[in-house]
A protein has these predicted regions:
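Non-transmembrane, aqueous-exposed alpha-helical and coiled segments at domain scale
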Residues: 1-190
Length: 190
């Protein structure tokens, strides 16, 4: 139980667990600062301001874009988006969906140009999950707990696996080919 509690407590902040909150806050900021969310030129200019750290939280990020592993597309987002579109139509949120779609199409190109990232950037599952929670009437304070609840089954499975393996030490199934390097003190690093 302590490990589960620690895992839940580690889900604080926008990096892991709070990213959909940041997307929602960013989208609200975009709506508040654009005269017309359907104006592509105005939206593109604002997205550039985000990337230059001149708008919203000044971090230089378009939240919900990019993933550490998935570059061409996040398979979770690809599947999820169909449900997002269906729910948006049912809830009468087509205008909001249109804004998300515009950002989904504009952001990767702008990020590639501004950041010189050419490996590919695509929306991740957090880009739409907060929008879905909002359409379902779920308060923002519950977004991160929902993120955690979805993982508890996996965490529990890992724990059961550990109990069944008689506490054997798990070792990586690969050998590093990187070689060794002399340690350089932190204050001496470039």
């Amino acid at each position: 139980y302590s490990a589960m509690a620690a895992a839940l407590c580690s889900l604080k902040g926008p990096r892991h667990g709070g990213a959909n909150l940041m997307v929602m806050q960013m989208m609200q900021n975009i709506r508040e600062n654009l005269h017309d969310t359907e104006d592509d030129e105005e939206l593109e200019a604002y997205l550039k301001k985000l990337l230059h750290g001149e708008a919203f939280d000044r971090k230089g990020l378009i939240y919900g874009m990019g993933h550490a592993v998935y570059s061409l597309s996040d398979p979770r987002e690809v599947v999820f988006k169909g449900y997002v579109e269906q729910l948006a139509h049912e809830k009468g949120r087509d205008k909001d969906l249109a804004l998300y779609n515009k950002i989904e199409h504009m952001a990767p190109q702008l990020i590639a140009e501004e950041r010189k990232i050419f490996k590919g950037v695509s929306p991740n599952v957090d880009f739409y999950s907060g929008f879905v929670y909002d359409m379902l009437g779920i308060p923002m304070e519950l977004y991160t707990p929902l993120f955690a609840v979805a993982r508890i089954a996996g965490w529990s499975a890992h724990r059961i696996e550990e109990l069944l393996s008689a506490n054997k030490i798990i070792r990586p199934a690969y050998k590093s080919l990187g070689g060794t390097h002399e340690y350089i003190r932190r204050n001496e690093r470039e």
